[in-house]
Amino acid sequence: MELSDEAFDRLISKAMDDLPQEYIKGLDNVAIVYADTPDQHQAHKAGLREGNILLGLYEGIPLTQRGAGYTFVLPDKITLFKDSILRVSYDEHSLYEQIKRTLWHEIAHYYGLDHDRIHFLEKRPPTIS
């Protein structure tokens, strides 16, 4: 599957619009970007092993770990990795859903959720409000 950078960017924007806005509006000083593949530093930081892929990465200090002196800092960064997301997607719908799922996963890290909690929430049936 191939996709232009512009089309990938549009899908990220749509996913941002479709995610619960209380979580999106709570993002403060966070850059959301994409790259084709993780660089060496990102791969090392994520513990990426040969044959594994990385869909996204949150780099920053989660809200739950920030103290009163947390000021004048560079933005946190959420990176989505286009080539990896394309590899696990089989059509346009699955591509969009994977972008949205990966974006939500990395935003959850911003809010301080660890992988166990994120996976628990992903498996839970949706609630009706």
Where are these regions (language model features)?
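Auxiliary alpha/beta "docking" domains used to position bulky ligands
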Residues: E122
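Short alpha-helical catalytic segment bearing the HExxH-like zincin motif
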Residues: Q98-E106
